[in-house]
Amino acid sequence: MKLNEISDNNGARKGRMRVGRGIGSGKGKTAGRGQKGAKARSGVSINGFEGGQMPLHMRLPKRGFNNIFAKDYAEVNLGMVQRVIDAGKLDISGTVDHAALKAAGLARGGKDGVRLLAKGELTSKVAFKVAGASKGAFAAVEKAGGSIALPEAQPSEQEKKAARREANKAK
């Protein structure tokens, strides 16, 4: 007996039914779709339509909203940073920023930068330059002898406009 001679027992795998292949097949002519109507025609049926019954997505209440001002940060835990430092994948001689964390494989996504979180333990002295950090992360980094530099907040367009108005009033 060879591997290429082995086959399944008869009836172990049921073949796929090919529809619309003549009346002798048992699924010819209408191919199991019945007579006429929208369900007999080609094309997909209406998604979510439950035959006139109130659909599930309308029975459930609306909830939440999408905040267009939400910041998208890549969250990085200090324990993971320490693990990467110990593995020699992160150079801590200079400032560790978003690009360095991304190169080390820690920061995925985060179009608005990196936010440090205090989960895990940091023992190395590291200077971070990131978009945000939790209070616990600040404390842990400073305890290890490092520092965290955050970007200075840029005034919004409304604040700039208000400042211009005040300057014009003073003239």
UniProtKB/Swiss-Prot annotation:
Keyword tags: Ribonucleoprotein, Ribosomal protein, RNA-binding, rRNA-binding
Gene3D superfamilies: 3.100.10.10
Sequence ranges of Gly residues compositional bias: 21-35
Chain segments carrying region Disordered: 1-44, 150-171
Subunit structure as annotated in this protein's UniProt entry: Part of the 50S ribosomal subunit.
Family membership: Belongs to the universal ribosomal protein uL15 family.
The protein's name in its UniProt record: Large ribosomal subunit protein uL15
Organism lineage: Bacteria, Pseudomonadati, Pseudomonadota, Alphaproteobacteria, Sphingomonadales
Gene, per the UniProt record: rplO
